[in-house]
């Protein structure tokens, strides 16, 4: 899935911005959070986040849920490189594993499990 942020901002500018952010805020992770285009879940009000390194994926999902005002009975899924990261994982761990070459971590969210693969889980038949 293509990132709208990547389409709107050239690579060198994104890389310079991520580098500046990481240099200025050592304990924060630069994250771009965007909605999966086909999803009927609400659009988020901003895409760029500076996330504390010690935040868990589950806590970040809570932040997204609050920003889009999603009721607790509605499902939300987040994807990093088409994988559902474990909710107990630290954002710093996910960042180190999946950060883009420009220095940002790209996260997509959806109301449906559109990609469907859990990290570290293989389907057996």
UniProtKB/Swiss-Prot annotation:
The last C-terminal 9 residues are removed to expose Gly-116 at the C-terminus. The C-terminal Gly is then amidated with phosphatidylethanolamine by an activating system similar to that for ubiquitine. Its main location: membrane. Induction: Expression is increased after the shift of cells from glucose to methanol. Keywords: Autophagy, Cytoplasmic vesicle, Lipoprotein, Membrane, Protein transport, Transport, Ubl conjugation pathway, Vacuole. The record marks 116-117 as: Cleavage. The keyword DNA-binding does not apply. Residues 117-125 form a propeptide. One of its GO terms (cellular component) is cytoplasmic vesicle. It is a lipid-anchor. It comes from the Eukaryota. SUPFAM superfamilies: Ubiquitin-like. InterPro entries: Atg8-like, Ubiquitin-like_domsf. One of its GO terms (biological process) is autophagy. A lipid is attached at residue 116 (Phosphatidylethanolamine amidated glycine). Gene3D superfamilies: Phosphatidylinositol 3-kinase Catalytic Subunit, Chain A, domain 1. Belongs to the ATG8 family. This is Autophagy-related protein 8. It comes from Pichia angusta. The gene is ATG8.
């Amino acid at each position: 899935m293509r990132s709208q942020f990547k389409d709107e901002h050239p690579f060198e500018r994104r890389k310079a911005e991520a580098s500046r952010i990481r240099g200025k805020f050592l304990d924060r992770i630069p994250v771009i959070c965007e909605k999966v285009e086909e999803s009927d879940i609400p659009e988020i009000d901003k895409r760029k986040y500076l996330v504390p390194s010690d935040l868990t994926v589950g806590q970040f999902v809570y932040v997204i849920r609050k920003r889009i005002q999603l009721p607790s009975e509605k499902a939300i899924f987040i994807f990093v490189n088409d994988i559902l990261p474990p909710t107990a994982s630290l954002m710093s761990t996910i960042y180190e594993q999946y950060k883009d070459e420009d220095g940002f971590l790209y996260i997509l969210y959806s109301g449906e499990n559109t990609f469907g693969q859990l990290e570290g889980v293989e389907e057996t038949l």
